[in-house]
Amino acid sequence: MTIFKTVRIAALASVLAGGTISAAGAADVVRHSEPGSHFPISTAIEVPPGATTIYLSGMGAPPVDKAADPKTLAAYGDTETQVRGALTRIQGELAKLKLTMGDVVNMHIYLVADPKLGKIDFPGMMKAYTEFYGTPAQPKLPTRSAFEVAHLANPGWLVEIEVVAVRTH
């Protein structure tokens, strides 16, 4: 009889531990920022156990001038326009997955030098980026890296963005 009591206690402990793990899995994502910094990125992010990670493929902007050759800059606009377009596309893809821009924890932005400027347009990128992040409506900031690259798959693109999002349960 003692052995059956031990098995029941072990089973009960296992069930209770499972409940504890589930509760821990429902924890929030923790975002860390540099103290006193107003730069709209997180310096580190902690993802709770049990969260699902979603990787979105890199996305460029949709054409803004459909009459222009789709392999030219004229079809997609400047850096600011392209970042806004790419982030809007990402927002749409996340929505299909029942996620928001606030669920993004990591972002890589690949930038090609704007031929009109002779360099990447970091201020233009930031202007469009801050329409989506660090706003009162959407204050959750991802970790982010921005890279200058020689070119992208579409010769008309100045920007390609890929993100990682998490879904907490």
Predicted regions and their residues:
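N-terminal presequence-like segments and the immediate start of the first folded domain
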Residues: 4-88, 92-105, 114-169
